[in-house]
Amino acid sequence: MEEVAGMQPDIICLPELFDTMFVQEQKPLSEVAEDEKVPGIVTSRIAAFAKKNNCYIVCPLVTKKDGSFYNSCLLVDRKGTIAGVYHKKHPVKTEIFPDQAFKGGGVIPGAIDQPIIETDFGKVGMLICYDANWSEAWDNLKKKGAKIVFFPSAFPGGRMLNYYALKNNYYIVSSTGGDARVIDISGNDLDSTSNFVRYAWAAINLEKVNVTTWPTNGMLPDLFKKYGDRLGIKVWGNTEVITIESRDPQLKVLDVLKEFRIPTYEELLKNETEVQNKYRPESGKK
């Protein structure tokens, strides 16, 4: 974290169980877990760093609450306070069974419906590792309005993360013990780690949306003519998706779409689904 502090990040995401990975098999769960309400050794240091560097930190570790243990993510805000907690919904069974992944106990699954968290730059969600295999978990974060999903993990997640980013029109930031990525809403990597750099970093624009090439492609000349470089427009031919972003703080991308009557990717699919359902044989429509 000290290496990236000079970049003045708004938020840093650490890997799953970054403080105890492999240690939890030697030390009792009760010793490595930290209370969610009372700052422990790790959370105190993370909080101090966040406050000093004016940034948020996604801090994944084992927590204890009301006598139970969870594989968790704490979101520490710029003031060094805990802004929210996420409990891993789908832990591997070896995490649950006592004395397998964790010495002297096991964690329990988090609630299926958990709130997303408000930050000063937008709503964020969190999922952890094995959660990646349940697509409804990703869809639910979209329904709740998440703009960025943080994914601390023990495995990379691969192409499924790129798909979820495109499908749900949000950014995904993954962080593992082996690699890290920042994935654009188009489903393409903005940055990733390498053999030479151990962290991924990217500036992201939340004034950015996905639309489909049809019917938008016919409107591109007029968009360029009116707004020029105030808009960033990228056509992704292989998925027939166009990303449109505002490069002007005074220009809201949704206002531009409304002006040109361009539906977002989600709006188009919603409308198409409504028409399809209306005319299905079981709907009674003749």
Q: Which residue ranges define each predicted feature?
A:
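Ligand-binding pocket scaffold of soluble enzyme catalytic domains
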Residues: V4, P9, A83-H87, I117-D120, ...
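Active-site-proximal beta-strand/loop segments in catalytic clefts of secreted hydrolases
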Residues: P15-L17, P60-V62, K89, I128-Y130, ...
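Alpha-helix-centered segments that form part of catalytic cores
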Residues: P39, K51-K52, V107-P115, M126, ...
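Short beta-strand scaffold segments in enzyme catalytic cores
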Residues: P60-L61, S72-L75, P115-I117, A180-I183, ...
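Active-site catalytic loop in hydrolytic enzyme cores
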Residues: K65-K144, R159, Y163, K167
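A short C-terminal boundary segment appended to hydrolase-like catalytic domains
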Residues: V209-K286
